[in-house]
């Protein structure tokens, strides 16, 4: 079965560069190896915390004051990604992949091309009868423990939903699940983002 990295960001405000926490779940051959959350210190010019965001994720400015910057955090992800050449999984890649792109550009980080899979997009195709396809709704449906907007918990829930999607279709990889619905995995590289599409 597939190996991949599930990610989830929380941001201090509406700017993608204000990422203040990152949840990472490493999956190898269908087994969750580890789920971690790391706080991220946003660049100074994007570090103002919006009270609305705080009410969602409960992260305070004091908690990221001495946190590593994204370029340091990225080294951990890149080590696993480059070693295994694995795709990323996100629940609504329109946010998480755009945050990743913005931060990679800001810190001028060179990186291998990243393929990505959107559990939200596939959930809409796989379970059209569900009233919605939000992460917390799917977690409840599949008895997945979730502390919503805790980045580590969100990333792990995303990983488990991705594995559920593989299991339902009896496939071996995220790419095969996507192909089942006529999609190709999305791509993030130095030229920009190519969304997961069926075109």
Where are these regions (language model features)?
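Acidic, divalent-metal-coordinating active-site segment for phosphoryl/phosphodiester hydrolysis
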Residues: 150-164
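Short alpha-helix plus adjacent loop in nuclease-associated cores
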Residues: 117-132
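Active-site metal-coordination segments of metallo-dependent hydrolases
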Residues: 128, 147-152
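Short hydrophobic/aromatic-enriched beta-strand-loop microsegments
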Residues: 111-117
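Short, glycine/acidic-enriched loop or turn micro-motifs at the edges of active sites
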Residues: 11-13, 121, 157
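Active-site catalytic microenvironments for nucleophilic, acid-base chemistry
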Residues: 103-106, 125, 141, 161-168
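Conserved non-catalytic scaffold segment of RNase H-like nuclease domains
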Residues: 1-103, 113, 135, 140, ...
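Acidic two-metal-ion nuclease catalytic site recognized across multiple nuclease folds
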Residues: 161-199
């Amino acid at each position: 079965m597939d190996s991949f990295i599930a990610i989830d960001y929380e941001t201090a405000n509406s700017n993608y560069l204000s990422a203040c926490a990152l949840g990472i779940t490493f999956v190898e051959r269908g087994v969750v190896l580890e789920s971690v959350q790391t706080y991220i210190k946003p660049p100074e010019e994007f570090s103002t915390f919006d009270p609305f965001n705080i009410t969602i994720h409960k992260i305070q400015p004091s908690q990221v004051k001495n946190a590593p910057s994204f370029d340091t955090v990225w080294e951990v992800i890149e080590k696993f990604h480059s070693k295994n050449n694995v795709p990323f999984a996100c629940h609504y890649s329109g946010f998480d992949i755009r945050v990743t792109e913005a931060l990679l550009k800001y810190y001028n980080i060179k990186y291998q091309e990243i393929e990505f899979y959107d559990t939200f997009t596939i959930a809409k195709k796989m379970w059209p009868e569900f009233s919605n396809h939000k992460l917390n709704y799917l977690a409840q449906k599949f008895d997945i423990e979730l502390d919503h907007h805790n980045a580590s918990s969100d990333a792990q829930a995303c990983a488990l939903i991705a594995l559920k999607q593989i299991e339902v279709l009896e496939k071996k990889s995220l790419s095969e699940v996507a192909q089942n619905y006529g999609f190709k995995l999305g791509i993030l590289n130095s030229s920009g983002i190519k969304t997961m599409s069926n075109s």
